[in-house]
Amino acid sequence: MTLLEMIQKENAAAFTHGGKFHADDVFSAALLLHFNPKLTIQRGNRVPEEFDGIVFDIGRGEYDHHQKDSRIRENGAPYAAFGLLWEALGTEILSPKMAECFDEKFVQPLDNNDNTGEKNELAGLIGMFNPVWDDNRRSDAAFFEAVTIAGRILEHKWERFRADERMEQQLSLIHISEPTRLQ
């Protein structure tokens, strides 16, 4: 079964780490929910043995980058969970060319932040959704609040990339190449 089929099946479920969250797991969850808003996402410190679903950013599986042999892109940028999921699903949302461009301009900076601590303003803003020490909110509630915002950001960003592609197509009709990107 492909990842997309797993996401879209009835009663689909996903699991990620609990506690403090980062842009990586938040955008990963938002990406999965794009394909199935009814997907149930559970958080915890350990993947339950009986769990039958998509596991990301924990568990040392296909969509977890916390392992010795974690993958690195050809340009040297390390994958985090969001990048691994985007690699599998990006062309379901954008054309191959635009999916690659989106990876380079949007996903890789978030993956770099998660892997190296490199400063990233968006990652910092998402991190601010984590409850402070004296906040009575549960971490899970804050996580899903951040996921909702991340989902809206993704939708708007994808539309910008689609608009760029439409612009390139229109400009190619009048033989202008390489327009200035507005991203």
Regions found by a protein language model. Give the residues of each.
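Short, flexible coil/linker elements and helix-boundary hinge sites characteristic
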Residues: H34-N36, E155-E159, I174
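Long, charge-rich alpha-helical interaction segments
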Residues: D140-E145, I149, I153, K157
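Charge-rich, low-complexity N-terminal segments
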Residues: F161-E165
